[in-house]
């Protein structure tokens, strides 16, 4: 059993960290997520502002069974699929 947190900018996932004990392992989401964060920040006029920084939020720690590396890999896949579904719905696809 391990704990994990997800870092979001607004509703866009950016990074995941999984804790085994106190030591975390972490992974950034694929580059396309940072590209989307940057694009959205520019479009909304938040780039380079304190409001941009205020959009970064870690979730509360959640518990999940499994090996930390396996949890990390599974979460990346799940978040990619969830985000892709959200984008398709927004575009009416």
Language-model-derived ranges and their functions:
Residues 1-25:
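Short, charged/polar N-terminal "headpieces" of proteins
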Residues 9-11, 30, 38, 62-65, ...:
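N-terminal, helix-rich and Lys/Arg-enriched segments in bacterial and organellar proteins
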Residues 21-58:
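Acidic, aromatic-enriched beta-alpha/helix-loop junctions
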Residues 47-93:
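Acidic, low-complexity intrinsically disordered segments
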